[in-house]
């Protein structure tokens, strides 16, 4: 199976991507998912084959999901619980003026 895939990134959540068949674009993606995802921003396009390696996803799962439901949703990697998120103003305290 060979598929030209459009990959969209979410403006709402870093690391969240939506893989779709380029021919169908976003037609098969449920409205509720699009509403939660935000306005999709085209990140890039790839030719997907079972032999291709993806950085964070199983290629066979991606291809199966696109064929069965019209899309594959890549969730952001889980953050470690011990990481504390600091306010932006604290992160800039040592920046030169």
From Swiss-Prot:
Give start and end of each YcgL domain: 3-87
InterPro entries (UniProt xref): YcgL-like_sf (IPR038068), YcgL_dom (IPR027354)
From what superkingdom does this record's organism come? Bacteria
Chain segments annotated as transmembrane: none
Q: Which SUPFAM superfamilies match?
A: YcgL-like
PANTHER family reported for this sequence: PROTEIN YCGL
State what protein this is by name: YcgL domain-containing protein PST_1364
């Amino acid at each position: 199976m060979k598929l030209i895939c459009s990959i969209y990134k979410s403006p709402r959540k870093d690391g969240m991507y939506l893989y779709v068949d380029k021919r169908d674009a976003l037609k098969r993606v449920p409205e509720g998912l699009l509403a939660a995802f935000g306005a999709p921003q085209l990140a890039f396009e790839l030719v997907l084959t079972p032999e291709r390696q993806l950085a964070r996803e199983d290629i066979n799962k991606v291809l199966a999901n696109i064929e069965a439901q019209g899309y594959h949703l890549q969730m952001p990697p889980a953050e470690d619980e011990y990481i504390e998120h600091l306010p932006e103003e604290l992160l800039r305290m040592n920046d030169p003026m």
